[in-house]
């Protein structure tokens, strides 16, 4: 199974606190777009981002992402650079009238993209040819050298798991407090039932991270969230890679973990991918780190939405609870991580 496959579910979110009228005015002022239709899309797995489909009077569609701030400028500059330098499979932000890749409106950041009509590869699957193409495109990304004015905005991997402290805070809260909220109460019960597993995930992530900070590793340009829910396929079989928000410099295993099977048996899709990507040496310790870190991130993120985020609505809490529980399902990311060897080993993949 592809690592991260629980993303097949979409976690609904509420609309941001900004009117449609204000959005339309902002698009006209900053992008010279006269929107005639605007539709909120309750999709995505990012609690700080909101999606809209916008249509102009000429029926030209756009995809508008509204964020509560931009934490990683590389997520804008890198796809724009890749697109401008011939990587057609990249969806990049469009420029404003002043040639910026975003515009600040009140407490929000507006980012406008072309609207691609298609389906997530995770939902519809990919052909052998598309898996090969995916491998080839990711290899191109990994060997890309960025100019200094862009690379200075790309953060390097630190191997310090940023969600670890939040997971610990939540674990302390769950084990010491009582809850009246229905979703908090249900998640607290489930969390306590899985206390030992969660503790193991956090401890192993931190331990492996410490080891990797003392290891000489090659860093490449990584998308960092390149599961197949972030690959769009059109009816014409074109492929587009979206959601570059987590872009960073890191070992290639950061991206390859989404493709490598959870066991030693190579799936057909995995083999097709590497037919396109080419021969590669896999650092087993780095692969283990990213699988464990991903689990801790999901535990912290879903848990935070239920316990810590004050403006989480009922829908967000419900879907976050479901997402949290699903992490522990057979064959999902936690089982895959726990079955990943975490000794220092390099293995060839071809």
Question: Residue spans of the language-model regions?
Answer:
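Active-site activation/catalytic loop segments of kinase-like enzymes and analogous catalytic loops
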Residues: 252-285, 292-310, 320-328
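ATP/Mg2+ or Mg2+-diphosphate-binding catalytic cores
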Residues: 173, 300-350
